[in-house]
């Protein structure tokens, strides 16, 4: 059976800011099984959790800061309120410029994973293109695998992997059970250009779906920006992924 489909709510951040509940209801009406929050524009985690529950929407995961230092309690409280299993975060390109910086960044990730585990959660790293650039002839993510604890998971963003010139299906296969969350997005795979509905761009989505068939827990649509109407693209992405049986929806 295909993994259930969710939407990263960053995709509809502008719409949510104008009216959180109507947009979430629209996502449920489309058939999305779950959502992945990244902030709560115009609402609170408590209010959002009640709305999600009333609509039967699962919270597959959430993007947040690292559960460390001053942010620790805030992140953990949010996770408890939403009843989620997976915490997801990442770092910017400047944190991976040298091997020493990669080590320091991975140490923060390892600490985050330990805090997550102590609180019954998992911690996943969300990638962009810079984790797949070369440093001294070696992809940055390969250094990361050297320094990361084996309990640490990944949310593979297949669009940014493709944009970096790497093969997303091969990455998903390589990571296996360490990649339970897949960010499915599509477009021209050119930095700075708007994305498209899933199925309308250059990402080899069928290959990704096949690679993650046995290991992906969630297929999460995310469009950072879009060349067409965002909510229309969100629905078209759902129709494509569920219609091709690459993901499982509620309709």
Residue ranges and their predicted role:
Residues 11, 41, 68, 93, ...:
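Flexible, active-site-proximal loop/turn residues at the rims of small-molecule/cofactor binding pockets
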């Amino acid at each position: 059976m295909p993994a259930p489909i969710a939407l990263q709510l960053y995709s509809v951040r502008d719409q949510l800011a104008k009216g959180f509940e109507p947009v979430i209801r629209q996502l449920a009406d489309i058939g999305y099984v779950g959502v992945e929050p990244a902030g709560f524009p115009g609402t609170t985690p408590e209010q959002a959790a009640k709305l999600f529950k009333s609509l039967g929407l699962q919270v597959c995961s959430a993007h947040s800061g690292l559960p460390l230092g001053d942010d620790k309690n805030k992140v953990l409280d949010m996770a408890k309120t939403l009843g989620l299993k997976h915490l997801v975060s990442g770092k910017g390109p400047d944190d991976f410029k040298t091997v020493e910086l990669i080590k320091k960044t991975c140490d923060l990730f390892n600490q985050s994973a330990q805090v997550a585990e102590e609180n019954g959660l998992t911690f996943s790293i969300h990638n962009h293109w810079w984790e797949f650039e070369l440093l001294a002839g070696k992809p940055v993510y390969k250094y990361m695998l050297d320094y990361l604890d084996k309990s640490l998971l990944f949310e593979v963003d297949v669009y940014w992997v493709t944009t970096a010139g790497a093969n997303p299906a091969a990455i998903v296969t390589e990571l296996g059970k360490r990649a339970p969350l897949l960010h499915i997005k599509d477009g021209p795979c050119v930095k700075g250009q708007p994305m498209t509905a899933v199925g309308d761009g250059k990402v080899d989505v069928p290959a990704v779906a096949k690679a993650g068939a046995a290991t992906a827990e969630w297929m999460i649509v995310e469009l950072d920006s879009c060349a067409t109407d965002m909510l229309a693209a969100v629905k078209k992405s759902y129709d494509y992924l569920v219609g091709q049986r690459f993901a499982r929806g509620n309709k």
